[in-house]
C-alpha cells in the first residue's frame, strides 16, 4: 500500500477510498486506523495547514468522512 502521495488530490482520494472500504467492511477496524494514521503522518504537509485540514482535503472528503477522521485521530492522540 502506498502511503506517500504526490498531491493533496491524491491524498484525499486515498483517504476517501480507505474510509469507503472501512464502511463497506472490506477492511478491519484496527487495519483501518493504522493505515489512516500512516497516510496522515506521511503526508502532513499536504493534509494540514495552520493545524487544520486543508480546504481541498475537506471538500473532497465531505462532512461524514471528516467526522470519522477527526474521531479516529482524537482517539489515537489520547
Predicted regions and their residues:
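Acidic, Ser/Pro/Thr-rich low-complexity regulatory regions
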Residues: 1-78
Amino acid at each position: 500500500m502506498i502511503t506517500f502521495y504526490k498531491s493533496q488530490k491524491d491524498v484525499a482520494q486515498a483517504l476517501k477510498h480507505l474510509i469507503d472500504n472501512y464502511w463497506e467492511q472490506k477492511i478491519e477496524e484496527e487495519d483501518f486506523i493504522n493505515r489512516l494514521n500512516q497516510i496522515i503522518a506521511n503526508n502532513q504537509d499536504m493534509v494540514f495547514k495552520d493545524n487544520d485540514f486543508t480546504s481541498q482535503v475537506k471538500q473532497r472528503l465531505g462532512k461524514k468522512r471528516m467526522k470519522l477522521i477527526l474521531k479516529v485521530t482524537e482517539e489515537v492522540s489520547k
